[in-house]
Amino acid sequence: MENQEFLSSSAPSEVTDGQVSTEISTCSEVFQKPIVLRILDTHRELEESEDPEKHENPEEPEEVREQDQRDESEECDEPHESYEPHAPYAPHKPRDSYAPYELHGPHAAPKLLKAREPRQLRHTREPRKSREAKETELLPSAAVMISPSLITRAPPRPQLSFLGANPVSCDFVRKCFSSRKRTPNLSKPKKQWGTPDRKLFWGNQDPIRPVSQGALKAQLTKRLENLAQPKEVSCHYVPNRAQYYHSCGRESVIWEITPPALFRQPSKRIQRLSQPNGFKRQCLLNRPFSDNSARDSLRISDPSPRILQLSVAKGTDPNYHPSKKMQTKISLSTLSAIATPRIIELAHPRIKLEGLCYERQRSELPIRPVPPAAMIAKPSPRTIALAKSKSVHQDYLPDRDAHWPVSYATTHSKASPRIQELANPNKRAPVRIVYYDPDVFKTKPAALKAQCSQRIWELSQPLTR
């Protein structure tokens, strides 16, 4: 089956489009095989194809050889004819010079070819074309770049004596490494986008870096085996436990406490050392702030006598009367009073008949009845004047619309230097200087000696209620 596929793929077609399609389909089928199997199949077909040529064609006439040479030259020229854009190559007229070879028709060569079954002979010579098509698709470095998981030894290269003995094999090897047919196939545009040319599976992809034969045949030494073992910990190590024999896989284990350690009393020296150190006053003053932004020169100063005096809370004045309580006392007479029937009647809510305050007589009458005298009465001029709506002042301006045109002067105005100066924010001292001012609570000596007046002393007294 594999030979038939290679033969079908290598057979030349006279139609250019058909040839391109058959070459692409066969290339995709061939590339699906691993590169190792392709190399082995190629060498096997090389040996099988050369043996029948030696045994079956010992006395091949010169006419058949010349005809084969012409066929090979035509096959080599076919890739140039397959390109459609090259219009000047279509009328290739120099081939008319081969017409005199048709004079060999009257000779007995056709009978000899028919007697020797030339079609079967041509079929035996067909693998040479398939080998040319397949070997040009193989990579030149296929003998070196082999997956180590499939084979440990590289396939043997053809010997020089074998290549020198057979000139056909020499040409085959040259065509294999030159890859003349593979290059034009790769230069053609893709027929279908998005579909890969071949499927990737284990063994047919080439490694990034070729693996050397020495690395594949390397033997493990005793030194490497010893270095591969995990590092052991000495038996004199303090945590001498089973899980500490090897450095990997350590666990957090609580140490066992002996019973004498539980009932032992610490000495006075240990108790004194266990107490936290007491900071001296000078150490606290010299200690810098925990905040890195504060300067080291700033220190906490001792409070002045004035600050200590102000820190004492003020006492309550003896004449101070607190605010009146919200609770009101009710007298006993009010609690023991009895309501009269009239008060009880007035305490009830007003009962509405059908949701109205008054009874309705006719539907056209208003809800509240109007007395006849009010309906006959005539309003006075004062009542008529008050009934009219208040007129708008003569200087009244209605509300301006939300959209109004902006004047030309407003749109093209420029800020004066004075306005720009006023627009700048006020320059103030930095916050850090004001915040960390050590003299912020310092009082002037004159303010400490000042005496308040009689009026100020009276205003400072709380209100007497």
Swiss-Prot record:
Coiled coil: none annotated. This is Sperm microtubule associated protein 2-like. Keywords: Repeat. InterPro entries: SPMAP2-like, THEG. Signal peptide: none annotated. THEG repeats lie at residues 174-192, 214-233, 260-279, 297-316, 333-352, 373-392, 409-428, 446-465. It holds the Pfam family THEG. Residues 40-70, 114-137 have a biased composition (Basic and acidic residues). Residues 1-29 have a biased composition (Polar residues). Residues 1-140 are annotated as: Disordered.
